[in-house]
Amino acid sequence: MDAFVYGTLRDPERARELLGHADFGPDALLRGLHRVDARYPTLAPGGKTQGRVLRLRDDDLEALDAYERVDRGLYVRVGVPGDQGALWTYVGDPTRLGAEVTWPGAGPFRRQVERYVDANDVRVES
């Protein structure tokens, strides 16, 4: 599965630095979530976000998870549907990033995001 990127990884030099390649698909639009600039960019319910499809290779998810600090709870990786198939994207925990964002529902942040994606028409269009 490829990834929808909306922050620093849209830059080919940054992607190449992290992954050793910068294989991009088309520019894309994520509907149902909008970008919020905080300590690092994140996504919030509603709106839309411009980004790119980053083509992933075998070990790329491990590198991306480390870059986004998934193990420390800074970001969560979630799957979103797309017109060319499902994609991964990363959503930053607003509490950890100092972002004024409210997600509906209760429970762990990952579950809040997953429930929102499932219950709303969140999707990537290229």
Region locations from a protein language model:
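Glycine-aromatic micro-motifs
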Residues: 1-126
